[in-house]
């Protein structure tokens, strides 16, 4: 009998065990689509990014004009640029939904998978930040200045660290050059980490909405979930095309249509929408070092989530109190995002401070307490 190449070839076997014959829980919902959607996002961003990099010039005197040239003179350059800029927004929408899914259904109890995922989020945030600097518009320049300056809050080595990152005494040509190098490199780091993420996931298998072991009822990934994933791909790519073609500048800042000018500060310096929640937490603390620590903690707190799980149940499916708390947390994050987009004045300052306090309070204090309380309720 002829060997089945798909199951025996050293390379095809890996693909087969990951995407075709993978035993998958029979009851996973649409919330489990976002992992593969993130994979498609990454591929789209790498392809459009490579095409843009062929026409981009990483020099302060040429960067802005090279982006303008791309949009005016390169065949479909305007489309490639709009797909790349809005693809980043879709990437973050998918990753936030993916993390929310993991949080709700207790997927974080696969500790290795979860921790690699948090590292992936941090790498993605770094990639998006350095990428935003490349067009060398006003918001690019001042965003880079403000965020890199935060490192100067580190005691003793801060100022040296910032000047080392800048390659001089301000954000200038060396900064732009190294940011381009980093922006080119990091997506490939993300791709590598993604493989590690998947390797750890396939050690344990996927979680499911009930949060219970599903070994007794698994189905092959293909055709059941491959076809379901293709629906997700279609919906996402249609959304991306619609955004890029109908309102490409909806999520951008008009300030970035002005070339970078170190002598004129924009009236409101703010990051892209996907960083606003963290920016609001940064601004909510009047002390510079305190703000930087809170900013770091707002994302690094994800590493603690597996350690703060007190419930006997894995998923929140049958935990109504935790569900209420979860949706309060989501609402709180939306409030932080809105506050981050507003100027730093009354009443936004106090709203931001309350929302920041509540964010940490819910995750560090209320979730563990409610988990214990629900365990008690099980015994009634």
UniProtKB/Swiss-Prot annotation:
Record's keyword terms, sorted? Electron transport, Heme, Iron, Membrane, Metal-binding, Mitochondrion, Mitochondrion inner membrane, Respiratory chain, Transmembrane, Transmembrane helix, Transport, Ubiquinone
Annotated membrane-spanning segments are 34-54, 78-99, 114-134, 179-199, 227-247, 289-309, 321-341, 348-368
**Record gene name:** MT-CYB
Q: What else is known?
A: Heme 1 (or BL or b562) is low-potential and absorbs at about 562 nm, and heme 2 (or BH or b566) is high-potential and absorbs at about 566 nm.
Membrane topology reported for the UniProt record: Multi-pass membrane protein
Q: Where does heme b b562 bind?
A: 84, 183
Which molecular-function annotations from GO does this UniProt entry contain? Answer: metal ion binding; ubiquinol-cytochrome-c reductase activity
Subcellular localization: Mitochondrion inner membrane
Coiled-coil intervals, chain numbering:
none
Entry GO terms, CC:
mitochondrial inner membrane; respiratory chain complex III
Q: Which PANTHER family match?
A: CYTOCHROME B
Cofactor field: heme b
Instruction: State the function annotated in the UniProt record.
Output: Component of the ubiquinol-cytochrome c reductase complex (complex III or cytochrome b-c1 complex) that is part of the mitochondrial respiratory chain. The b-c1 complex mediates electron transfer from ubiquinol to cytochrome c. Contributes to the generation of a proton gradient across the mitochondrial membrane that is then used for ATP synthesis.
Record-listed a ubiquinone binding positions:
202
UniProt name for this protein: Cytochrome b
* Assigned protein family: Belongs to the cytochrome b family.
- Biological process, per Gene Ontology: mitochondrial electron transport, ubiquinol to cytochrome c
Q: What subunit structure does UniProt give? A: The cytochrome bc1 complex contains 11 subunits: 3 respiratory subunits (MT-CYB, CYC1 and UQCRFS1), 2 core proteins (UQCRC1 and UQCRC2) and 6 low-molecular weight proteins (UQCRH/QCR6, UQCRB/QCR7, UQCRQ/QCR8, UQCR10/QCR9, UQCR11/QCR10 and a cleavage product of UQCRFS1). This cytochrome bc1 complex then forms a dimer.
Residue sites binding heme b b566 per the record: 98, 197
Q: How is the cofactor bound?
A: Binds 2 heme b groups non-covalently.
């Amino acid at each position: 009998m002829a060997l089945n190449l798909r199951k025996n070839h050293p390379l095809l076997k890996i693909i087969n065990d990951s995407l075709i014959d993978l035993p998958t829980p029979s009851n996973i919902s649409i919330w489990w689509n976002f992992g593969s959607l993130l994979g498609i996002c990454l591929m789209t961003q790498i392809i459009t990014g490579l095409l843009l990099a062929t026409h981009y010039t990483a020099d302060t005197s040429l960067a802005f004009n090279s982006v303008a040239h791309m949009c005016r003179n390169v065949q479909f350059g305007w489309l490639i640029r709009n797909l790349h800029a809005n693809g980043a927004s879709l990437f973050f929408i998918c990753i936030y939904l993916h993390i929310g899914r993991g949080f709700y259904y207790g997927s974080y109890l696969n500790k290795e998978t979860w921790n690699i995922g948090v590292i992936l989020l941090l790498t993605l945030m770094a990639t998006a930040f350095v990428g935003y600097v490349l067009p060398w518009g006003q918001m690019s320049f001042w965003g880079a200045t403000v965020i890199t300056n935060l490192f100067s809050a580190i005691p003793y080595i801060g100022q040296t660290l910032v000047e080392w990152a800048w390659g001089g005494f301000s954000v200038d040509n060396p900064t732009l050059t190294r940011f381009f190098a980093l922006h080119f490199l990091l997506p490939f780091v993300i791709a590598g980490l993604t493989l590690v993420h998947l390797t750890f996931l396939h050690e344990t298998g996927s979680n499911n909405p009930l949060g219970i072991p599903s070994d007794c009822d698994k189905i092959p990934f293909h055709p059941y979930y491959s076809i379901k994933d293709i629906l997700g791909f279609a919906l996402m790519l249609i959304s991306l095309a619609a955004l890029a073609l109908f309102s490409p500048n909806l999520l951008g800042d008009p300030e970035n249509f002005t070339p970078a000018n170190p002598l004129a500060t924009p009236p409101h310096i703010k990051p892209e929408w996907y960083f606003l929640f963290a920016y609001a937490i940064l601004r909510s603390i009047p002390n510079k070092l305190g703000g930087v620590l809170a900013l770091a903690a707002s994302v690094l707190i994800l590493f603690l989530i597996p350690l703060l799980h007190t419930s006997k149940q894995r998923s929140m499916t049958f935990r109504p109190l935790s569900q209420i708390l979860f949706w309060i947390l989501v609402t709180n994050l939306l409030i932080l995002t809105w506050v981050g987009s507003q100027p730093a004045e009354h009443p936004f300052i106090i709203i931001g401070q309350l929302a920041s306090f509540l964010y940490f309070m819910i995750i560090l204090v209320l979730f563990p307490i409610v988990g214990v309380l629900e365990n008690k309720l099980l015994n009634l």
